[in-house]
């Protein structure tokens, strides 16, 4: 296994031992050579709103870049601005990368086929898929090397879009 996608998170208000267990688990996976990709959480856009385990240095945290898009749902049209952002309490820029996460067709938990969902949990698998493509070209990369390759491939840069992050996922730049 090369990639672990974690599209769940816990708030800083969660029990300390549960936080530490999850952070230890993702750090250990990273140390074993597994690229850990996590969702930033939907508690933004304020600073220090990234959920655990996305605050770890040993994960790639993904936010949603299209979180201001108007969605159509059961309650009509609404606008959301939800992606968690850093910096973290340890001054780490998070999320590192942004990807599409609004109005994504996904599996229904009620076994009724598919539904449309929005959130950073929808954006993280997009990045995991792009990383899987990159591992086909760079199979010997460590998670740290892959994270650096991703950093070099984003476009536009975070400062160009007014966000504290590396920038938006650009799959073509990542795999060439």
Regions inferred by a protein language model and the residue ranges of each:
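Substrate-binding/access-modulating region of protease and related hydrolase catalytic domains
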Residues: 1-58, 89-92, 110-124, 162-163
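C-terminal subdomain of the subtilisin-like protease fold in secreted/lumenal serine endopeptidases
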Residues: 1-5, 136-176
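Sec/Tat-exported extracytoplasmic proteins
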Residues: 5-8, 30-33, 40, 63-66, ...
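Short linear functional motifs in flexible/disordered or boundary regions
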Residues: 16, 65, 74, 109, ...
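Solvent-exposed, polar/charged alpha-helical surfaces in well-ordered, non-transmembrane soluble domains
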Residues: 24-28, 60, 125-132, 144, ...
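A short, acidic/glycine-rich surface segment
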Residues: 47-48, 81-83, 158
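Extracellular S/T/G-rich loop segment that most often corresponds to the catalytic His/Ser-adjacent loop
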Residues: 54-136, 173
């Amino acid at each position: 296994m090369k990639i672990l996608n974690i599209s769940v998170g816990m708030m800083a208000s969660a029990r300390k031992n549960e936080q530490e267990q999850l952070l230890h688990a993702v750090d250990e996976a990273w140390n074993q050579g597994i690229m850990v990709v996590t969702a930033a959480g939907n508690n933004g856009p304020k600073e220090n709103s990234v959920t655990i385990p996305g605050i770890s240095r040993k994960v790639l945290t993904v936010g949603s870049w299209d979180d201001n898009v108007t969605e159509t749902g059961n309650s009509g049209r609404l606008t959301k601005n939800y992606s968690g952002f850093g910096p973290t309490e340890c001054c780490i820029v998070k999320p590192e990368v942004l990807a599409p996460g609004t109005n994504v067709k996904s599996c229904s938990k009620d076994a009724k086929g598919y539904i449309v969902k929005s959130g950073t949990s929808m954006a993280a698998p997009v990045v995991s898929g792009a990383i899987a493509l990159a591992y086909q070209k760079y199979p010997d990369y460590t998670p740290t090397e892959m994270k650096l390759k991703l950093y070099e491939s984003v476009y536009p840069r975070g400062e160009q879009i007014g966000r504290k992050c590396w920038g938006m996922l650009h799959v073509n730049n990542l795999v060439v």
